[in-house]
């Protein structure tokens, strides 16, 4: 299963671990993804999404109905 946010599309980034001696080794920065259930009043049901913490703030700001409408317009839900 891909580590991708359902709402924002955030994915893992690639960077470096840097030691005290300035040696660099590749690493992945993973997004902070959580499975959350959202109650959709208009559909009278729960919707389960894998969202980042940034997406949670976006849902708090715009509302779950608006976010789901955007997802459906993109063909992702």
Swiss-Prot record:
HAMAP family: Ribosomal_bL28. GO terms for biological process: translation. Belongs to the bacterial ribosomal protein bL28 family. PANTHER family: 39S RIBOSOMAL PROTEIN L28, MITOCHONDRIAL (PTHR13528), LARGE RIBOSOMAL SUBUNIT PROTEIN BL28M (PTHR13528:SF2). Keywords: Ribonucleoprotein, Ribosomal protein. GO terms for molecular function: structural constituent of ribosome. This is Large ribosomal subunit protein bL28. Pfam families: Ribosomal_L28. One of its GO terms (cellular component) is cytosolic large ribosomal subunit.
